[in-house]
């Protein structure tokens, strides 16, 4: 069943989500502070003309949520857009409507609605271009660190030390590119919102 206005109203506010966090709070707050800088005057005009409501699904243990949920939160804050957040593991009926590739409960999810509560579309996990960048970096790291034991094996079959080095590199690469990738997230949300008309209900 789609997220009704009534169900939407039962979601967490951004502050309520933050207050419930038990993991990754410091990184999340840092991302919130930095994300404000990615918005433009063009974004302000766009969302004035295409106001939307945003339902987000996430969990604090997920790295993609820690990176991209702050984008949705700051977008809503900057442009006065209604936003509610639902914990994935407590709302499986919701996440199961937005499965990645029809089978994965990937998060975050952003679902956008117009003023008449028509669903305009949704964003899942991360921009495809970011996934491509991450895969390219993984290949580069494996090639330049071929001396690491098992570096070309499936991740779950790698020795612990190799997995640790890969995680360290992936984390560095992600946060080095955070603002650019967050900007791509904004652009994808704008593409979804483009079919909305003025006059969204607050």
Predicted regions span which residues?
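Non-globular targeting/processing and membrane-anchoring segments
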Residues: 1-52, 77-82, 88, 96-106, ...
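Short amphipathic alpha-helical surface micro-motifs
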Residues: 37, 65-67, 93-94
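Local sequence-structure signature of Cys/Sec-based thiol-disulfide redox active-site neighborhoods
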Residues: 43-74
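Structural microenvironment flanking redox-active thiols in thiol-disulfide oxidoreductases
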Residues: 60, 90-95
């Amino acid at each position: 069943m789609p997220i009704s206005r009534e169900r939407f109203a039962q979601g967490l506010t951004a502050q309520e989500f933050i207050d419930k966090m038990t993991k990754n709070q410091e990184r999340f707050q840092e991302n919130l502070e930095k994300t404000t800088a990615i918005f433009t005057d063009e974004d302000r005009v766009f969302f004035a003309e295409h106001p939307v409501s945003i339902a987000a699904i996430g969990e604090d243990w997920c790295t993609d949520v820690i990176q991209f949920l702050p984008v949705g939160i700051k977008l809503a804050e900057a442009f006065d857009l209604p936003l509610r957040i639902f914990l994935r593991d407590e709302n499986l009926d919701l996440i199961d409507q937005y499965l990645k590739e029809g089978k994965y409960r990937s998060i975050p999810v952003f679902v956008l609605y117009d003023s008449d509560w028509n669903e305009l579309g949704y964003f899942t996990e991360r921009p495809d271009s970011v996934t491509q960048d991450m895969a390219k970096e993984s290949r580069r790291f494996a090639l330049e660190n071929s001396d690491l034991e098992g570096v070309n094996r499936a991740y779950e079959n790698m020795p612990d030390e190799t997995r640790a080095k890969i995680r360290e590199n992936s984390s560095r690469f992600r946060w080095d590119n955070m603002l650019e990738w967050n900007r791509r997230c904004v652009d994808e949300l704008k593409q979804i919102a483009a079919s909305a008309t003025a006059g969204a209900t607050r």
